Amino acid sequence: MAEPTGLLEMSELPGDSSVPQVGTASGVSDVLRGAVGGGVRVQEAREGPVAEAARSMARMPGPVPGPIPSSVPGLASAPDPHQQLAFLEINRQLLFREYLDGSSMIPVRLLRDFEERRRLFVEGCKAREAAFDADPPQMDFAAVAFTVALTASEALSPLAD
């Protein structure tokens, strides 16, 4: 392997270097050689001034924090946001009803008419649902055959996978 020349010859000998020499062609091989056979360079790199500076920066001042006790409030002790939003929605509905009841701009008879129409609509929906559940409409034979054929063709299709 060709060692880079120039600065190396002027400053120090190749064996005395504490930093692995990186050349354009053999940058990785020097590090691998140190890791495989000559452990001197690898150990020097672990004990060099850069490694010491990195270790000192990694140390935290003060004691190492331990596990967080369960009595400390955190994310688990936060209230459920859905429950809070449901509470806000109930309050909003109550405030709206109070506004409508107390507002002189909307006549009371008009409000009662809206409530009566809403009540009739809900009762009609419930009656239609009960009638459908009691006697569901029969599907004709052609629609049943089409549904079965479509389901079978989808199950056998290579696109189903």
From Swiss-Prot:
Domain of life, per UniProt, equals: Eukaryota
- This protein's record includes keyword Transcription: yes
Provide the protein's localization. Answer: Nucleus
Q: Does the keyword Repressor apply?
A: yes
Identification of the protein by name:
EP300-interacting inhibitor of differentiation 2B
What does the record note on quaternary structure? Homodimer and heterodimer with EID2. Interacts with HDAC1 and HDAC2.
Annotated region described as Disordered, given as residue ranges: 1-26, 54-77
**Which comment does the entry carry about domains?**
The C-terminal portion of EID2B is required for nuclear localization.
Role according to the record:
Acts as a repressor of MYOD-dependent transcription, glucocorticoid receptor-dependent transcription, and muscle differentiation.
Keywords from the named record: Developmental protein, Differentiation, Myogenesis, Nucleus, Repressor, Transcription, Transcription regulation
> Could you give one GO CC term from the UniProt record?
nucleus
Q: Name one GO biological process term.
A: muscle organ development
Its chief place of residence is nucleus
Q: Which GO terms describe its molecular function?
A: identical protein binding; transcription corepressor activity
Q: What is the lineage of its organism?
A: Eukaryota, Metazoa, Chordata, Craniata, Vertebrata
**InterPro entries xrefs:** EID (IPR033258)
List the transmembrane segments: none
